[in-house]
Design a protein with these regions (language model features):
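Short, glycine/acidic-rich hinge or "gate" loops at secondary-structure transitions
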Residues: 1-22
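Sequence/fold signature of self-assembling virion shell proteins
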Residues: 18-50, 77-191
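Short, basic/hydrophobic alpha-helical segments
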Residues: 49-61
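Conserved active-site beta-strand-loop modules that form the wall/rim of enzyme catalytic pockets
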Residues: 64-67
Length: 191
């Protein structure tokens, strides 16, 4: 879980003066299309489409973001987008499906996923990097986890009947498409 949190929220540190080096996560490396919204701004379908267009303009025709990571509150807001569609529901099914998993704009197709470590009001106190909801849009194949040392289990001294061990490894976030990515924060609690 610490690795997953660091990939999203890590803060860059060079490791001088006796502190350990740390990497910048997605919220730290996305700078070209990073903005803070006015307090209480609500995420709209038009704004979503505008962000996708800006990503397409900065990254080129094949490089608009294709994965959106948002906290649960914003995912619920996106679930309410209609994209001008009419929904037909079989009445005998007695089931209404609302979640939006894929959204298509003129800039391309994007998968929408709620993520527990994207800054938002629904994050736990221990993991909240911000008190405002954030939106991350990335081109998935332009980001990779690069291992400096592949994780491995290292056994430690035996303690009674218990065998102790630890997982050791080093990694960093490799990013090749920062210009195509979007990071917006400051959305209202209800999206």
């Amino acid at each position: 879980m610490k690795q997953e949190y660091a990939l999203v929220n890590g803060a860059l540190s060079s490791g001088v003066s006796g502190t350990g080096a740390s990497m910048a996560g997605l919220t730290g490396v996305i700078t070209t299309l990073a903005t803070s919204r006015n307090s209480g701004t609500s995420l709209s379908e038009t704004e979503f489409q505008d962000m996708h267009q800006h990503s397409w303009e900065k990254g080129g025709t094949d490089n608009a973001f294709d994965l959106v990571l948002v906290p649960f509150n914003l995912k619920r807001k996106i679930d309410g987008f209609t994209a001008g569609a009419t929904k037909y529901v079989d009445q005998s099914d007695k089931k209404l499906t609302q979640p939006v998993a894929i959204y298509e704009t003129s800039a391309g197709v994007a998968r929408i996923m709620q993520h527990r470590y994207v800054p938002g009001t629904n994050a736990s106190v221990a993991t909240a990097a911000s008190s405002a909801n954030a939106f991350l849009g990335i081109k998935e194949d332009l980001y990779k986890v690069a291992y400096l040392r592949k994780p491995f289990k290292e056994m430690l001294a035996k303690d009674g009947d218990r065998e102790n061990g630890q997982i050791v490894g080093e990694f960093t976030l490799e990013y090749r498409g920062e210009r195509t990515s979007v990071y917006r924060q400051g959305y209202a609690v209800n999206g």
